[in-house]
Amino acid sequence: VEGGAERSGSVLNALLHLHAQGAADDDWVLVHDAARPNLSRDDLDKLLGELMDDPVGGLLAVPARDTLKRVDKHGRVLETVDRSLIWQAYTPQMFRLGALHRALADSLVADVAITDEASAMEWAGQAPRLIEGRSDNLKVTRPEDLEWLRQRWSNRR
């Protein structure tokens, strides 16, 4: 499947491919970042088990640990954010194929900034469910993330 210019385009292409292969609109699809190679089997099983009968779907997430600040464009703190209401979105994210396809396609037409599948579903008026996962399912985006992952995996032996 050919990737798109952004994540949403890549996922949309994958969903179109699934449709072409005979997948139904009410089939579940899971979207996972290749940049998150440390997904645990327990988290995957938990996500599948807790969302299988959910009307919308959802995603793995972890509660924010650190104090969070909202800043202005100059880097000045405007306020401290209540972290009890803030979660970090992880993957995989699990939604019905048809609903996710419509949400992504419509958001692209509307030129809405979509950062993950859950944000597309939110834009479409749905409320995805958060399933608490492990914090070590981190996204490898910085050199120190890769070094942490290498150390973690070398300790498994």
Give residue spans per PLM region.
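Short phosphate-binding loop-to-helix
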Residues: 1-26
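Short aromatic/hydrophobic "clamp" motif used to bind/position activated sugar donors
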Residues: 29-30
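Hydrophobic helical membrane-anchoring modules
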Residues: 137-157
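Glycine-rich beta-alpha junction loops
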Residues: 63-66, 135, 144
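Acidic metal-phosphate-binding loop of nucleotide-sugar-dependent transferases
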Residues: 7, 34-38
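Conserved core of the sugar-phosphate nucleotidyltransferase
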Residues: 25, 38-129
